[in-house]
Design a protein with these regions (language model features):
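Gly/Pro/Ser/Thr-rich low-complexity, intrinsically disordered segments predominantly at protein N-termini
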Residues: 1-180
Length: 180
């Protein structure tokens, strides 16, 4: 019989696993190796573009890679997108010390070398269920992005397409070719 002890978000926050990416899925710890160079470069480039746009237009707050968001409780789920954005009207007056108990408006996932399609789809479903309005899954190997919206619609963007912030990140546009 396997160990069925579930971890809480508070326990995850205190966990010390340097050089690892951690998330909590329904109380179960998931530990992964860091993303590679391409993953990091694409996530940073897109995060920088989003941050510059958000600051220029005072749209809200951008969170860096591996910021955990507690999106389910009992058992806890803590997910950490590569980039996250929350709109200005949702920015808390006092930033939580631990994991925020709310979902961002935009979650960006840049696929890493060890990401599996079924796990990525599960993560997208969890983000949308938690209230994320727009999810971008960027695949640097295939040079594509998939856009998932809260209304259930989705789109596959090829290498020549442009990411659009729609009503979530108004005015933001980033050609995918700029990410590679």
């Amino acid at each position: 019989m396997g160990d069925t002890t579930l971890m809480t978000a508070d326990e995850l926050l205190r966990l010390d696993l340097p050089d690892k990416r951690t998330e909590l899925i329904r109380g179960r710890l998931v530990v992964r190796d860091p993303g590679g160079a391409r993953h990091g470069a694409v996530a940073m480039t897109l995060g920088y573009r989003i941050m510059a746009h958000v600051e220029a237009h005072d749209l809200g707050r951008v969170y860096a890679a591996e910021t955990g968001f507690k999106i389910e409780s009992d058992p806890d789920t803590v997910r950490a997108p590569d980039v996250a954005f929350i709109a200005q009207d949702r920015v808390p007056e006092v930033e939580p010390r631990g994991y925020p108990g709310w979902a961002p408006d935009l979650a960006v996932e840049v696929l890493a070398h060890d990401d599996h399609p079924a796990e990525t789809l599960e993560k997208v479903a969890q983000w949308l269920k938690a209230g994320v309005r727009l999810v971008w899954v960027v695949d640097s190997e295939r040079r594509t992005a998939r856009v998932y919206r809260a209304d259930g619609s989705e789109a596959l963007l090829d290498a020549n397409a442009t990411l659009d912030g729609e009503d979530v990140l108004p005015g933001f546009r980033c050609p995918l070719v700029d990410l590679w």
